[in-house]
Structures are given as structure tokens and as C-alpha cells.
A protein has these predicted regions:
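C-terminal transmembrane helices and immediately adjacent loops/tails
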Residues: 1-154
């Protein structure tokens, strides 16, 4: 549930980032809604798809431990995960860059600015989840270290 929320928020942020870059501002109608051929709409939905992929990178790093910091096991220590990350990045680049894939998946090329935005997502998700894990660890330690006098007598 938590990772789904983070992925959805990232996807929405990427969609609105693409709309904003095209000139959309709060209070104005979104570009291309209901018009599948609108290039702004296609780019915005491509960004939303790519954001899901990039969000999954942060999520897969985080889900390796339930409450311990991912840095305690090593961020890049799992070879299969590293290969999977490289594969999914290559796949999103292929379906956004090459016309045959663009036609099948209804995507458009992304700019370096777009990829810059997308590259911010994994560390952001990693940071948010590390904060959550630290809070869980702190609460767990407080519960385990609070000894009542009755518990000591047993």
C-alpha cells in the first residue's frame, strides 16, 4: 500500500511536470485530455509511465529490508536487482526512443530534463522510506527498552 502510494504520487508529479513544461498552469485546462494524438498529452502520459519505472527503482532498493536501513545491507549488493534495474531502464528508453515501440506503447521521446526529473525519484523514495524505517526502529526500541517495575520482578 505504501509503495503504491509513493508510485502513484511520483506518476502524478511526472504527468503534471510534463504539462507544466508545455505551458500549463494551475487553473488552466490540461493539454490534450481526451485527444490521444496531442503531443503534450502523449509526452505527459509517457512521463507518468517512466515515473512508475523509476519509482520502482527506489522501491526495490527499500523493500530489501523491512525495518533496517537499506545501507546496512548495501544499496548495490544484490546482483539480480542491479540487473533488473538496468533492464527496466533500458526497456523504458527503448519504448520511448524508437518509433516502432512508440507506436505500440503510444509513447514519445523524453528530453534530458525529463530524465533529470525521473532520476530524482529513486533517491527521493529511498529517503522517504529510510525516514519511515528510522521511525519504526525508534518506536520499536522505545517499546523494548521501557521496562516496568512489575516486569523486573518476574
Amino acid at each position: 500500500l505504501w509503495y503504491g502510494l509513493l508510485g502513484a504520487a511520483s506518476s502524478l508529479a511526472a504527468y503534471f511536470f510534463a504539462q507544466y513544461q508545455a505551458g500549463w498552469r494551475l487553473g488552466l485546462p490540461l493539454f490534450g485530455v481526451g485527444a490521444d494524438a496531442d503531443p503534450v498529452y502523449i509526452r505527459a502520459t509517457t512521463m507518468a509511465l517512466a515515473a512508475i519505472v523509476f519509482s520502482q527503482i527506489g522501491e526495490v532498493w527499500n523493500c530489501r529490508t523491512e525495518t533496517a536501513s537499506v545501507f546496512s545491507v548495501g544499496l548495490f549488493s544484490n546482483r539480480q536487482i542491479n540487473i533488473g534495474i538496468i533492464f527496466e531502464i533500458c526497456l523504458i528508453v527503448f519504448i520511448t526512443l524508437f518509433p516502432p515501440f512508440q507506436d505500440v506503447f503510444h509513447t514519445s521521446p523524453l528530453s534530458l530534463t525529463d530524465y533529470g526529473f525521473l532520476c530524482l525519484l529513486p533517491p527521493l523514495i529511498l529517503f522517504v522510506e529510510e525516514i519511515r524505517k528510522a521511525i519504526v526502529r525508534k518506536r520499536h526500541n522505545q517499546v523494548n527498552h521501557s521496562v516496568t517495575p512489575q516486569a523486573e520482578e518476574r
